[in-house]
UniProtKB/Swiss-Prot annotation:
The gene is rpsM. GO terms for biological process: translation. InterPro entries: Rbsml_uS13_C, Ribosomal_uS13, Ribosomal_uS13-like_H2TH, Ribosomal_uS13_bac-type, Ribosomal_uS13_CS. Transmembrane segments: none annotated. GO terms for molecular function: rRNA binding; structural constituent of ribosome; tRNA binding. Belongs to the universal ribosomal protein uS13 family. It comes from Mycolicibacterium paratuberculosis (strain ATCC BAA-968 / K-10). Residues 95-124 are annotated as: Disordered. This is Small ribosomal subunit protein uS13. Keywords: Ribonucleoprotein, Ribosomal protein, RNA-binding, rRNA-binding, tRNA-binding.
């Protein structure tokens, strides 16, 4: 099993897909990485040579912010917004959707399970 930036890549998947297991790397970025390193995107992870693996590792570490560093940066950005008290920070603090979604209905993922109100009955 190939290991890049602390992530075990699945052996049987194509490199284009396998690289997306790294936090911060999607399909587009994966294709950019493979083009820059000259590795065929249809190559399976198990077929990579040690030389190609080293080249991939060096490229990712030198040019991209991924995994722990990226997670820390995102958390720091959220913390900063909360501290300065901007609208997005307030939404984060209250656990509500940040990007303008409706909250009268839906938004259950952000708000958590429904809280029942005692004494409230259905109007006829």
């Amino acid at each position: 099993m190939a290991r890049l930036v602390g992530v075990d890549l699945p052996r049987d998947k194509r490199m284009e897909i396998a690289l997306t297991y790294i936090y911060g790397v999607g399909r587009t970025r994966s294709n950019e990485i493979l083009a820059a390193t000259g590795i065929d995107r249809d190559l399976r992870t198990r077929d990579l040579t040690d030389d190609q693996l080293t080249h991939l590792r060096d490229y990712i570490e030198a040019n991209l912010k991924v995994e722990g560093d990226l997670r820390r940066e995102v958390q720091a950005d959220i913390r900063r917004k909360i501290e300065i008290g901007c609208y997005q920070g307030l939404r984060h603090r209250r656990g509500l959707p940040v990007r303008g979604q409706r909250t009268k209905t839906n938004a259950r993922t952000r708000k958590g399970p429904k809280r029942t109100i005692a004494g409230k009955k259905k109007a006829r």
